[in-house]
Every structure is written in structure tokens, then in C-alpha cells.
Amino acid sequence: MTEEQVLNTHNAEILLSAANKSHYPQDDLPEVALAGRSNVGKSSFINTLLGRKNLARTSGKPGKTQLLNFYNIDDKLRFVDVPGYGYARVSKKERAKWGKMIEEYLVTRDNLRVVVSLVDLRHEPTQDDIQMYEFLKYYEIPVIVVATKADKIPRGKWNKHESIIKKKLNFDKNDHFIVFSSVTRDGYDEAWDTILAEL
């Protein structure tokens, strides 16, 4: 069964932005959180999966997402875009505030079914990437690691880069790892199939 048969992915809209749990939607729709460092390609990932060009705003300015952005998908599912981490030009105080907001959502939100943790296929995971993965494993939150920007690397080198990332993350072989490109749409079907299997 494809995602199109399960839900109309094009029927999507940004629902609300929230700073804390009092602002979260009050229902039982399943949620998929998307986490990753600034400019890893989260907005492009969302837009590609939902078949929309500008639903999630892509920005040349890292650290632009400062709230939890909830996207309603066909009234059956929500994506939750969490603030990009690891951006140096944000104050320590602001980063700490974001960290608390993200942690509160990830640890306390009953609607959360899985976290899509995005990393850049071209580079080794940063310390922030590693800490995010360790955090999710510690709290036993289901995680899918998606390595973005695959189109920037020759296809023949994908396996090598995947191995490097998995080693640095101390990757759990029971988790899913998907190589993805918003340009070529590589990984599109696998991403949807894996997400839907977690709901």
C-alpha cells in the first residue's frame, strides 16, 4: 500500500507554531517529528514528501525555525518541524531555550510516534547529531535516520558515507537508515513506507 492510498499527502497545511505544550494541538492524531541541524535540508525534505514547493519555508539563514511547527496532513497525520540545532550565531541562552522546548516535546508528547533524525550524507555527524541520536535511544523514542543531500555525492560513494555516519552514531542496526535527495527524490518511497509503518 502506498502513502497515496493511505492519505492524500498533497492535502497538507501548516497548522500552528508552538513554544510549549500549552500550544500543542489537543487531539490524538499521530505525529512524526523532524529533527536535524540547521540547513540539513529539513524544509526541503518536508516539501518533497508532501509534494509542495513552499509549504515549509526553506531559508538561506540557518536557525530560522524557532518554534515547533505543526503540519496537518489530510487530517490523519502531523509532521512536527523542530528548531534546527547547532547554529553558532544564536545566543547560548536562545539555544538553551530551544533545547528545553525540543526536549519537552520529544519526552512528553503522547502523540509522537517516531522521530526522523536528519543528517547530511556528505559529512560526518556533528556532536549535536550524535547527542540527538543518543537522546532518542536513551528515551526509547523510535527513530529513522535520513541522510540528506545524496545528489551532492556520486552514487558509488553512498555506501562509504553511510558506513562512516553509522559508525560515528554507534548506529543501532534495528533502526532504519535512508539515503535521501530532495532533488532526485531518491529515498522518497522508502521514507514514506518507513514512516507509515511506525504509525
Curated annotation (Swiss-Prot):
Keywords: Cell cycle, Cell division, GTP-binding, Magnesium, Metal-binding, Nucleotide-binding, Septation. It comes from the Bacteria. GO terms for cellular component: cytosol. The keyword Cell division applies. GO terms for biological process: division septum assembly. It holds the Pfam family MMR_HSR1. SUPFAM superfamilies: P-loop containing nucleoside triphosphate hydrolases. Its cofactor is Mg(2+). GO terms for molecular function: GTP binding; metal ion binding. GTP binds at residues 36-43, 63-67, 81-84, 148-151, 180-182. Necessary for normal cell division and for the maintenance of normal septation. Belongs to the TRAFAC class TrmE-Era-EngA-EngB-Septin-like GTPase superfamily. EngB GTPase family. This is Probable GTP-binding protein EngB.
